[in-house]
Swiss-Prot record:
Belongs to the ATPase B chain family. This is ATP synthase subunit b, chloroplastic. It is found in: Plastid, Chloroplast thylakoid membrane. It comes from Adiantum capillus-veneris. InterPro entries: ATP_synth_b/b'su_bac/chlpt.
Length: 184
């Protein structure tokens, strides 16, 4: 049976281990060479690895700080945008209220103007009616006066005799003389 040392490293490899050197054949590497290589890598690679990790840590921290600053700026911009939105909504409400007020005022002015026009039309109509009424009354008066004059002339012509005409002429001549004497 074989010993444990022969299982781990056969006796053919012990001769190579006796000489100090590095076996580059990966299939022929024994445990000591492997530990030696790992130790050297660990000893010299530790500083490089630490530097890489520190650089990576700084990069991550800087990235986090930049992200936090961008988040803060974005939050501030969002707050400003919300404030502007709120102001815009207030301004829109104000404009809407002003528009509704103007519309209501214009509607009232239009209704008032229509009422005034209607009132003026009514007054004009009433004036025209009164004018036509006065004209009709005047025409009726003229007709009544004409008819009365015609009847009076007919009546006078029927009653007028020569003797009555002479008396009337004498009476009026007397009146004219009396007026002439008063004026002189």
């Amino acid at each position: 049976m074989r010993s444990l040392s022969e299982i781990i490293a056969p006796s053919s490899y012990w001769t190579l281990a006796g000489t100090i050197g590095l076996n580059t054949n990966i299939f022929e590497i024994n445990l000591i060479n492997l530990i030696l290589v790992l130790g050297i890598l660990f000893y010299y690679g530790k500083g490089v690895l630490i530097n890489l990790l520190e650089n990576r840590e700084r990069t991550i921290l800087n990235t986090i700080q930049d992200a936090e600053e961008r988040h803060k700026e974005a939050t501030e911009k969002l707050q400003r945008a919300r404030l502007r939105l709120q102001q815009a909504e207030m301004k829109a409400d104000e404009i809407r209220i002003i528009g509704l007020t103007k519309m209501d005022r214009e509607r009232r002015d239009l209704v008032d103007a229509a009422d005034n026009d209607l009132r003026e039309l009514e007054e004009s109509k009433n004036y025209a009616i009164r004018f036509e009424k006065q004209r009709a009354i005047e025409q009726v008066r003229q007709q009544v006066s004409r008819l009365a004059s015609e009847r009076a002339f007919e009546s006078l012509n029927g009653r007028l005799t020569n003797e009555f005409q002479l008396r009337m002429i004498d009476y009026h001549i007397g009146l004219l003389r009396a007026m002439a004497n008063k004026s002189t």
